[in-house]
Amino acid sequence: MEASAGLVAGSHNRNELVVIRRDGGGGGGVGGRRAAEAKAACQICGDDVGEGPDGEPFVACNECAFPVCRNCYDYERREGSQACPQCKTRFKRLKGCPRVAGDEEEDGVDDLEGEFGLDGREDDPQYIAESMLRANMSYGRGGDLQPFQPIPNVPLLTNGQMVDDIPPEQHALVPSYMGGGGGGGKRIHPLPFADPSVPVQPRSMDPSKDLAAYGYGSVAWKERMEGWKQKQERMQQLRSEGGGDWDGDGDADLPLMDEARQPLSRKVPISSSRINPYRMIIIIRLVVLGFFFHYRVMHPVNDAFALWLISVICEIWFAMSWILDQFPKWLPIERETYLDRLSLRFDKEGQPSQLAPVDFFVSTVDPSKEPPLVTANTVLSILSVDYPVEKVSCYVSDDGAAMLTFEALSETSEFAKKWVPFCKKFNIEPRAPEWYFQQKIDYLKDKVAASFVRERRAMKRDYEEFKVRINALVAKAQKVPEEGWTMQDGSPWPGNNVRDHPGMIQVFLGQSGGRDVEGNELPRLVYVSREKRPGYNHHKKAGAMNALVRVSAVLSNAPYLLNLDCDHYINNSKAIREAMCFMMDPLVGKKVCYVQFPQRFDGIDRHDRYANRNVVFFDINMKGLDGIQGPIYVGTGCVFRRQALYGYDAPKTKKPPSRTCNCWPKWCCCCCCGNRHTKKKTTKPKPEKKKRLFFKKAENQSPAYALGEIEEGAPGAETDKAGIVNQQKLEKKFGQSSVFVASTLLENGGTLKSASPASLLKEAIHVISCGYEDKTDWGKEIGWIYGSITEDILTGFKMHCHGWRSIYCIPKRPAFKGSAPLNLSDRLHQVLRWALGSVEIFFSKHCPLWYGYGGGLKFLERFSYINSIVYPWTSIPLLAYCTLPAICLLTGKFITPELTNVASLWFMSLFICIFVTGILEMRWSGVAIDDWWRNEQFWVIGGVSSHLFAVFQGLLKVLAGVDTSFTVTSKAGDDEEFSELYTFKWTTLLIPPTTLLLLNFIGVVAGVSNAINNGYESWGPLFGKLFFAFWVIVHLYPFLKGLVGRQNRTPTIVIVWSILLASIFSLLWVRIDPFLAKNNGPLLEECGLDCN
């Protein structure tokens, strides 16, 4: 696809394409090796390395060839550590160098004339060099060389059999007289033969010498033997597993090949010492809950029956909610990846990369709430990712059709030509320039290149200029012209009307487009804005993502997709390789539908007041799900398998053959299971299984065909697919695009070679038209699923119902980082949107309570999905339960009768179990107590505000058809750090928790004053009520701090609420009259001074 083709706009009902031209450019060069070696400088003293006796550059270390001159080499051996400064390998003694302590014992090695047989020619360097070269740089006796005579090969004896194909370095040492002529002289290393027709010779030795002279029997020899034995055991183990070619050919790359055959990842179960006590306390807590509820139900409070009934109902609901949340954590696991093995298998140096291509999706809607600079940093981090350039394509979806986003992306593509080579040259992290230059670290650490400081300063200056240009575009966009925006060539911007515009595609960078400043190729960068027309349901973000799926299938069709929010940049450039360790693993990869990474955030205050990091969910719940069927999809930072998004069933797992007569005697089979096998034998022969594609007709279980039933790569497989699959059914399912339908049959990706770029561009415009999805399965069984504003839950749920599994990957360096809402109001609105999406799923046909039975969804995985759509309903009992303490303190009643010793035991046992469960959960997961406690606090804050409103809004939408508007969460800019934390924005979500706080404060004051007036007898029952009230206040404390805002700055709304509720409190105070002693007897009326 030509990157300079220009912006292409089109419509589904207009048979035309409009192309707006743009410009492009590129260039590059290399040097030579020999001159560089000749001028190599010693890394110790700075002098030239110089040449050795053979005329080649002097090499001190044969392991790493670290540049060291002869003088420094002699000094380090004599006075220094005697080791290479780089690889720490001990320097070996070279010819002509003085001996030092620690050199290996060699007979006569100090006598050059006797060692090399110079015969008086020790001053002839040419003779010495030729002798050493013929000896393969070994310590042989050059003078003993005789004219070459082939020596009969003496193979090793292995298990009593002769093996003739053993490589030379594995032959045994043999005396020189073996071979009838001793053509090998007294050499102790094999002779190098240039003629391949000459048989390989055995290693000869002098029988008059002791074997220790050749290294046999020494400590070093024993260590080598132990290492060799371990290697043989490892090779034997791999051989038993049936992997590879084990003919003993002695290939030098064999260790690397062994490593490449190893698994690319492995599961790391939580140690039993940490997880078993956790499981035990869960079981104990269940038992204690049973006894606790038995007591609560059997001992009602007669004088406060309503309070007792409400509390019991709430407690039962909390217990059920805890069970739904707890049991998916029963089998938590962690995972490790091996990037070196991935490279050895799929990305060998000097060979074309075999890594799978990946399409990156970035979605944005409103540049006023999602700053273009934030989006630009995300795109730059993608373009500079550590992955083969030809395998990366980045698609940016602009669902707001904003010219500001288009122009910012154009500037980003130009800056990428400088930024991408800088990142890859110096291997910096992270590769989003805004966050890289904000790092408060010593950037000189571990950077030895002298040019790094200079180039970093120049790059920072270029980035500041880039920011100025982006901010200028933002400032210009604040004033919209009356006639609308126009492009540089004078044509009107096609997206002036956000709700009525054609589809637009612009390829900024690509394989044939602009190159970077060093002349290297850049990844493809494509701008996409789908068509919008009045009267069509565009399905918000889910519809935009499905449009990107179709466009990318037409233009690049990578088998894997990565979707990111515009404010989530790649923090670990090797994140995609981490995902490929699972996706491309030949053992487990075929059944993996997506790899989910945890969300990590920048710019959050140290205390994380509103639990923005959500550590408990990402480090506890998701690890638990990974041990079942995989984590749920959270909307960003996820690598998908394209075929799984197309609604295909997961490949069927081949079951191992059962133990039948192949491994048991015939008489055993006849006796033990004769009836069963006899019955099978008498049945009709099974018809031959045909490998075909099929569609399931059930509406709620209508995935496409199972990919596992197609043999990829078989002769004529593609022809069979096209012939077997009904074309009409495919078009009805995927839409009326023959190019796109054909791409869905390519499991390993790739575009159609017969299609021209012009035809692909036309198809790309067609598949993003607003009417393309009509009467298809898009949003129902294919792609991102419609029906909820939290499309991520539905999408992952449908994949798991098709039998796929997902993977949770937590690299040591966070893969992606994003921005989180800092102020209280934005955080509550974010939680409101999530909860509203769950309520919508609860009332839809895809509710996990009744959808997907009989499919591939596992039982505990269903528990998790049920919990994810039921949790907003917990807000109703939570609100009631948080109100009870204030009512109890104001009325003098309580939700429990007077406790007996047995009842106190159950109450104390339950509290201890709750406490110990939290401690053990933090212990096995590694979550800090601060994060765990913030999560508990915000569970109450969100429950009595956002979740409560989500339930009522969801009911209004279902029952009355009142739709709620989707609000994009504002992304952080580059203002003062944590300035948004103290910003107060009034919203109705603040009313319920504010009321709860004031009610409980009033209740505490009323209860204490009542106890003071009634004497010490009432203090005992008061402690239980006060504990109950303080439990509520402590959980709402972060909300109280957010409500007050900065010090000495109380919001007006708080003052108004305080006055209003103070008035109510005054009326209650008069009604309670706490200063009047309460008696059960008759009231005495004051009738004057003399009452008698």
From Swiss-Prot:
UDP-alpha-D-glucose binds at S363, K369, E370, D399, K540. PROSITE patterns: ZF_RING_2. Binds 2 Zn(2+) ions per subunit. It is a multi-pass membrane protein. A zinc finger (RING-type) spans 42-88. Residues 103-116 have a biased composition (Acidic residues). One of its GO terms (biological process) is plant-type primary cell wall biogenesis. This is Probable cellulose synthase A catalytic subunit 6 [UDP-forming]. It comes from Oryza sativa subsp. japonica (Rice). The gene is CESA6.
